[in-house]
Amino acid sequence: MNFVQPVIQWASLAPILIVLGAAVLGVLIEAFAPRRVRRPVQVTLALLAAAGAFGAIAWRWAEVIGGGGGAPSTVVVGQLVEDGPALAAQGIIAILAFVGILVIAERGRRGAPGSEDAFAPQGASVPGSDYEDRARRAGLVQTEVYPLVLFSVGGMLVFPAAGDLLTLFIALEVLSLPLYLLSGLARRRRLLSQEASMKYFLLGAFSSALLLFGIALLYGYSGSVAIGEIHAATQATTGMDGLLVVGLVLLISGLLFKVGAVPFHAWTPDVYQGAPTPITGFMAACTKVAAFGALLRVVYVVAPAMTWDIQPFLWVVAVLTMVVGTVLAIVQTDMKRTLAYSSVAHAGFLLVGVVAMSPEGISSVFFYLLAYGLATIGAFALVALVRERDAEGNVTAEASHLAQWAGLGRRSPVVATVFALYLLSFAGIPLTSGFVGKFVAFAAAIDGGAWPLVVVGVLASAAAAFFYVRIIVLMFFTSPAEEAGAPSTTVVRSQGFTAVAVALTAAATLVLGVWPTPVLDLLAQATKFVV
């Protein structure tokens, strides 16, 4: 028996290796570096890893898509795929991860009130215990979050590029497990944070079971877990369509959990509310990109032969997601829960682009993900800066109740104005990136014959504008309630990381709304999947 040595295309793996290598190096830094230098070293390493990954992705794009001599293909013995959609998803993830790490690194200006990061000084301590109190007084800083974030980003880079379903599952676990931990590390409201972590873990395990069951059925149908071979089996196999449809529905359901689509959205409001706010922004933006990248590959590569069987399922999920997300967002009184249900509604709008089943649908989904992700990270970055101040003048938890945002436009007009920009983008108001994202997604759906979904999407967008405008009215045209002993609202001064992140995301929201053509043209090249 002759053993054939597998050929590994190291250049194609460069973005993933950069991020995972930096994550491993971050673990070694935690073990051996002096405590005083860990934070600056970890922040620098994480930012360089995200920037380096984006540079490697840009290089691979030039080689594979830009005519540099390469071609879209499967790599690492078919375990991964290097094609336009995979590189587009990876590039967006790298951009959002860089901005998200900037927000995670924020700890307030030294000596100013609230000059602490968002993470518990000792994650393993019992909330309110003497151990936690001693860790807080000692000024301990949880720098393990940076390698955890990088491990999650590494899984996200693999997820949309997976060439077989086992690689897809492993990538799902690699991106999810760090997020389960990070969700329970909030410095403030520790019990709520730990509850969010437990709910996310339990429901995530349930979704993983659905995904695995779907993989098992698809393997039984095709005799392979390779996505390309399953596609080939759909063209040749007859008499087993029931097995294929059930397997696809279960597999897609597992992916829809990560997207936050109805009825797989139950974790979203609780986790978004309880997790550290910077992690919420990172998770809401980056996880969505990775999950939609994988969903597009499954729907466009495996499911085309079963379009008439799968499309009704996706249509129902899209309608429910848009309607339920919008209606429940309207009745929320907590800012983070409002943005959580807004995220659910946006998942529905993105699904409208997915069901277009056309190249324009693919490029529109990626543009929407970029626009939504940038605005989301910026919005949660500002939520983390708006805090409560008690009667003694101590700055405490985030001012997450909507009533606490009343009059913010007078106290901090810059913060309120930029936050209003993000809200207008979420609402799809012209001259913002959110408008262009919705427009191209809905246009692709109309061309694909899904005009009823577009009608529902337009009506849901109009209804969603109510709660976005309500927050803007609160900030600029409502006086804050003054109750004796009630905490006031203040905006903590940024150390600089959040200021840079907000400046980048706000500028991108405007530029992509006014001049989206270069990005749309670039993404139009990333619409062909390798089978």
UniProtKB/Swiss-Prot annotation:
Going by the entry's taxonomy, the superkingdom of the source organism is recorded as: Bacteria
Q: How does it sit in the membrane?
A: Multi-pass membrane protein
Q: Which reaction does it catalyse?
A: a quinone + NADH + 5 H(+)(in) = a quinol + NAD(+) + 4 H(+)(out)
The entry assigns this protein to a family as follows: Belongs to the complex I subunit 2 family.
Primary role: NDH-1 shuttles electrons from NADH, via FMN and iron-sulfur (Fe-S) centers, to quinones in the respiratory chain. The immediate electron acceptor for the enzyme in this species is believed to be a menaquinone. Couples the redox reaction to proton translocation (for every two electrons transferred, four hydrogen ions are translocated across the cytoplasmic membrane), and thus conserves the redox energy in a proton gradient.
HAMAP family from the entry? NDH1_NuoN_1
- Which NCBIfam families does this one have? NDH_I_N, PRK05777.1-4
Subunit record text: NDH-1 is composed of 14 different subunits. Subunits NuoA, H, J, K, L, M, N constitute the membrane sector of the complex.
The protein depicted here goes by the name: NADH-quinone oxidoreductase subunit N
Identify the species of origin.
Beutenbergia cavernae (strain ATCC BAA-8 / DSM 12333 / CCUG 43141 / JCM 11478 / NBRC 16432 / NCIMB 13614 / HKI 0122)
